[in-house]
Amino acid sequence: MPNSSSSKVPSIKAQHRIAKKRAVRRRRIDLDCGCSIYIHINCAKDGNGFTHMGRHHCASGREFRFYLGGSKSPLFQDVQXGGSTLHAHKDIPHTNPVQPQPEESTKSSQSVPELPSLDGIDSSFWDDIFE
């Protein structure tokens, strides 16, 4: 009599275990500023780009990273000179990519100024709480 368990679909736990072992297929794009962007292969098929530091980059860059087998050793294939395809958009205002930071203040860092300063509370108050 044939074994009926051979026709069963693997359990969901087994399917998840197999999916976790599968390598994520992604493409690496090295930018001129030194940053590296990884784009999932399925996302890159749409041809959408992205903006980084005020510059628009095409998602169809020429440098790919493939992971081979279990060793995960990188193999680079550069079809053209490296880097990403850059498009200058005249419609997008290109301001300084460095955002100004708020100046540091010497005032209290409490967000609600009506609350009393914690430094002014007597130490016996804290002793009663933590006993």
Curated annotation (Swiss-Prot):
Position of sequence motif Nuclear localization signal: 13-28
Record note on modification: Phosphorylated.
InterPro entries per record: Gemini_AL2 (IPR000942)
A cellular component annotation (GO) from this entry: host cell cytoplasm
Compartments where located: Host nucleus; Host cytoplasm
Major place of residence: host cell
Origin superkingdom: Viruses
Residue span of region Transactivation: 117-131
Region of interest (Disordered), residue spans: 78-131
Zinc finger map (unnamed): 33-52
Any one GO biological process: symbiont-mediated suppression of host innate immune response
Molecular functions (GO terms): DNA binding; structural molecule activity; zinc ion binding
Protein keywords: Activator, DNA-binding, Host cytoplasm, Host nucleus, Host-virus interaction, Inhibition of host innate immune response by virus, Metal-binding, Phosphoprotein, Suppressor of RNA silencing, Viral immunoevasion, Zinc, Zinc-finger
Physiological role: Strong activator of the late viral genes promoters. Enhances the expression of the capsid protein and nuclear shuttle protein. Acts as a suppressor of RNA-mediated gene silencing, also known as post-transcriptional gene silencing (PTGS), a mechanism of plant viral defense that limits the accumulation of viral RNAs. Suppresses the host RNA silencing by inhibiting adenosine kinase 2 (ADK2), a kinase involved in a general methylation pathway.
Summary of subunit composition and partner proteins: Monomer. Homodimer. Homooligomer. Self-interaction correlates with nuclear localization and efficient activation of transcription. Monomers suppress local silencing by interacting with and inactivating host adenosine kinase 2 (ADK2) in the cytoplasm. Interacts with and inhibits host SNF1 kinase. Binds to ssDNA.
Family (UniProt): Belongs to the geminiviridae transcriptional activator protein family.
Domain notes: The zinc finger and the transactivation region are involved in PTGS suppression.
Protein's recorded name: Transcriptional activator protein
Species assigned in the record: Squash leaf curl virus
